[in-house]
């Protein structure tokens, strides 16, 4: 998501070499100044209408941006994306790295004023794991003892029997004991992740659509939602029941949903928006130079999904045969000139991909995990043609019509038109189709496509956040990939307590993935956001979320 996620046996270096979270428009000490001169209200174009605001269901960065500001986990993340106390004031970790005992702050409350207890976390985490919830992100909690068995239950009766065996127990109102199946080097950071946020059992069970209405959405973060107009705006206001409310300076954030980049840019330039999530690609170079936009590092990869599941046969049996041909997939990968894409199309500081796992994650020896080049970033047309011929389609002869699906937001059209032209050079012609973001997510998740835009922003700073999404049982496996050898390596890496061996296993897993090429990496991502110079203290994380808990307005004319 989409996108730093300790004392224990398999601790590894979690520092991302691409940098820390960045504070926008904030000079030293300035953040602590009194902010009485300006109205503390901010208008931010989110550029999307989130599919959901339910932390258990959300799987997209836009939803996580809102969730990160209206909810709060056991831990928060500092500006290095490392765990610090959040709803929990402290914790202890057992010597074997398996048991975490969290102690909640006293007198925590929901935004409606009702008490928040450790049992709310127990309920929320088990709700994510409950098969009935169908959470795409349930895999992020499978580190917990008994979680995998509960999540895999086939019947309501089986789920009920396995629920109590999950290693999450509220022993009193302020104590939560968590038992892991194996030591996890980034578990504390995970508790700051969207899927681990608490929800109110009372609210959830009273209304299945609780997260779609400001009147029913109850949260526990620095802000609360007070208005939700579909495809128009979401309004957040300061949560007076937040434990750290005195540090929150903004009174109101209006999040707009203008999806067309050029329209959003025009509104930003005219002063209608104080901040925009995406800058029109045609404006990026000049905007960054003029300091009306800022490019931030992102621990993420953009790629193309190839549907290798049996479901693609229902769309077109001929397309299924082609897409199931590994030589064909490798040909497509080698025909793409990623250097041209990042220099002439995206133009926002991205770097051409040569692997799936993003650059910026260090191994135990301090070296970047991503060092092996699986293909030439600038492409290799001759190699692509050779692979296409070996696949049985010399110069594209005999290929059926193929369709690539993408969502048009964020300038994706220009990217996929460029790829379409590159593939034509080896004789592969594809039709481009678009779907708006919410529909696109549903189509992709249900495997009702041939090829589609894919993107992944790390949930924590470890290669596993990229590697385990392609396990055959992963809800995030939106391509239907199934390789038993790959699954075995990932499972072994998760159980391995020797950091060096664990990284070696993940390297081998990526070797298999890139040989099979069910996804085609394009580039390592960045974020370019428009931020007015009077907007201070906004923190943009390489993992995706944008934090407004320390933001304020100063010097706005």
Protein language model features and the residues they cover:
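N-terminal lobe/hinge region of extracytoplasmic solute-binding protein
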Residues: 45-95, 218
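Aromatic- and charge-enriched surface segment that lines or borders ligand/interaction sites
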Residues: 89-140, 177, 264-267, 321-324
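Alpha-helical secondary-structure segments
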Residues: 117-124, 173-179, 221-222, 250-252, ...
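Structural transition elements
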Residues: 351-390, 409-412
């Amino acid at each position: 998501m989409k996108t730093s996620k300790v004392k224990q046996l398999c601790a590894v270096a979690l520092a991302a070499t691409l940098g820390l979270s960045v504070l926008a428009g904030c000079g030293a000490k300035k953040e602590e100044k009194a902010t009485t001169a300006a109205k503390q209200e901010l208008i931010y174009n989110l550029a999307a209408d989130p599919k959901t605001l339910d932390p258990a269901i959300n799987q997209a960065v836009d939803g996580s941006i809102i969730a990160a500001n209206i909810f709060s986990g056991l831990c928060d993340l500092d500006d290095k994306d490392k765990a610090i106390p959040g709803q929990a004031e402290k914790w202890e970790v057992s010597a074997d790295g398996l048991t975490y005992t969290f102690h909640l702050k006293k007198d925590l409350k929901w935004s409606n004023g009702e008490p928040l207890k450790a049992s709310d976390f127990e309920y929320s985490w088990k709700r994510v794991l409950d098969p009935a919830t169908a959470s795409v992100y349930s895999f992020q909690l499978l580190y917990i003892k008994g979680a995998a068995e509960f999540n895999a239950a086939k019947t309501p009766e089986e789920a009920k029997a396995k629920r109590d065996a999950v290693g999450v127990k509220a022993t009193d109102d302020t104590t939560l004991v968590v038992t892991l199946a194996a030591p996890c080097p980034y578990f504390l950071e995970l508790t700051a992740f969207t899927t681990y946020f608490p929800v109110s059992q009372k609210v959830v069970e009273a209304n299945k659509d609780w997260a779609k209405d400001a009147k029913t959405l109850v949260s526990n973060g620095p802000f609360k939602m007070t208005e939700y107009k579909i495809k128009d705006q979401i309004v957040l206001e300061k949560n007076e029941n937040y434990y750290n409310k005195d540090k929150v300076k903004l009174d109101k954030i209006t999040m707009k949903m203008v999806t067309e980049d050029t329209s959003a840019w025009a509104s930003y330039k005219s002063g209608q928006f104080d901040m925009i999530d995406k800058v029109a690609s045609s404006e990026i170079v000049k905007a960054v130079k003029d300091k009306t936009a800022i490019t931030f590092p992102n621990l993420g990869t953009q790629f193309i999904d190839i549907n290798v599941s049996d479901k693609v046969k229902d769309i077109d049996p001929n397309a299924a045969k082609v897409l199931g041909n590994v030589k064909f997939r490798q040909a497509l990968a080698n025909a793409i000139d990623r250097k041209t894409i990042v220099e002439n199309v995206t133009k926002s500081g991205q770097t051409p991909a040569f692997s799936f796992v993003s650059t910026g994650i260090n191994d135990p020896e301090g070296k970047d995990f991503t060092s092996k080049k699986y293909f030439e970033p600038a492409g290799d047309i001759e190699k692509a043609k050779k692979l296409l011929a070996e696949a049985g389609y010399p110069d594209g002869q005999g290929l059926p019509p193929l369709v690539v699906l993408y969502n048009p937001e964020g300038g994706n059209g220009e990217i996929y038109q460029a790829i379409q032209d590159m593939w034509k050079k080896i004789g592969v012609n594809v039709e481009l189709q678009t779907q708006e973001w919410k529909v696109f997510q549903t189509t992709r998740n249900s495997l009702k496509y041939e090829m589609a835009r894919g993107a992944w922003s790390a949930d924590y700073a470890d290669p596993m956040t990229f590697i385990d999404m392609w396990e055959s049982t992963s809800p995030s496996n939106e391509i239907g990939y199934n390789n038993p050898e790959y699954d075995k390596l990932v499972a072994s890496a998760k159980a391995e307590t020797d950091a060096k061996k664990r990284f070696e296993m993940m390297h081998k897993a990526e070797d298999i993935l890139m040989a099979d090429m069910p996804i085609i990496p394009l580039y390592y991502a960045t974020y370019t956001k428009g931020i007015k110079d009077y907007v201070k203290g906004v923190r943009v994380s390489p993992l995706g979320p944008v934090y407004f808990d320390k933001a304020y307005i100063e010097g706005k004319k």
